[in-house]
């Protein structure tokens, strides 16, 4: 993590001192699962975003960190036995984006473009509970970790808008619609809603 942060600081230093925007805030992420997902509850997972941006010509380019994920719940009952499974998946990405901004009012700007994500690492925690069986009743917790080699290059649409409180400080709401699968052989895509503060240097 320290190396990643140093890389971001280095890239930030490469940007001109004027015109740099620092953005940071909260993510609410979930996933689109194209496989059979009957009886599977797919819920939002909290995360964070932290990145820097700068304008080059008519476009804005940014680099930073995004944490995505999902919460999954499933319960199956048969012959008096109930099996409940609750899972949390967290995925960390180094992201790059390019957007085209359009000012619709003096303080309001909307934008659209693309975002790429290179996987850093991830983790899944799964809690399984069995009840009604008697002998096999109980709860177990398992976890699994992934590194960058396990994760596919992510890409998708990046849309949003900025509201400037003053010349330096503003609020951003954005949406990432993943168009690529998160792992090889898995038809699952990330979707993220973000609310962030931005600061113009």
Where on the chain are the PLM-derived regions?
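Flexible, solvent-exposed loop segments that connect beta-strands
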Residues: 31-42, 69-92, 120-151, 182-186
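Outer-membrane beta-barrel "beta-signal"
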Residues: 19, 162-169, 189-201
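Start-of-domain marker
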Residues: 18-68
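Sec-dependent N-terminal signal peptides
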Residues: 3-13
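Residues that define the transmembrane beta-barrel architecture of outer-membrane proteins
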Residues: 18, 42-48, 55-57, 90-94, ...
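Repeated loop/turn-to-beta-strand initiation elements of outer-membrane beta-barrel proteins
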Residues: 20, 57-61, 107-110, 167-173
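Transmembrane beta-barrel domains of outer membrane proteins
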Residues: 51-55, 99-102, 160-164, 172, ...
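Transmembrane beta-strands of outer-membrane beta-barrel pores
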Residues: 26-30, 56-58, 65-69, 116-120, ...
